[in-house]
């Protein structure tokens, strides 16, 4: 079985989201606390992430993602802690939901709302 959170972390670290496409459900939902509208559809979500990664590359930026365990408010749920531009201050926490062995939801959240520990 594919470690879907690990795959997502790898995609962020390599700045390449193409490998993620077959692992997103057809009705995958992408939400962000910084964006008003929710995106729906695996292809739509993947296309958005690919476009975003191209913008990051074009500006010379970088992203680092690390696996964490949430302590609060969702005890023991694993997530990705993302850093953008430096590896000291996290920019967001990424939570996923899995249904039928595919990612059905990606939630981008403010890290200040969580307590976590590195895996």
Regions found by a protein language model. Name each.
Residues 1-119:
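C-terminal and inter-domain tail/linker signature
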């Amino acid at each position: 079985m594919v470690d879907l959170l690990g795959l997502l972390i790898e995609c962020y670290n390599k700045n390449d989201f193409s490998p993620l496409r077959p692992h997103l459900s057809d009705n995958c939902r992408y939400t962000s606390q910084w964006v008003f509208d929710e995106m729906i559809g695996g292809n739509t979500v993947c296309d958005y992430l690919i476009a975003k990664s191209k913008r990051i590359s074009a500006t010379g930026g970088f992203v680092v993602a690390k696996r964490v365990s949430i302590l609060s408010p969702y005890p023991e749920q694993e997530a990705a802690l993302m850093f953008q531009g430096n590896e000291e201050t996290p920019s967001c926490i990424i939570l996923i939901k899995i249904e039928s062995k595919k990612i059905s939801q990606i939630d981008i959240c403010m890290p200040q709302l969580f307590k976590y520990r590195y895996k």
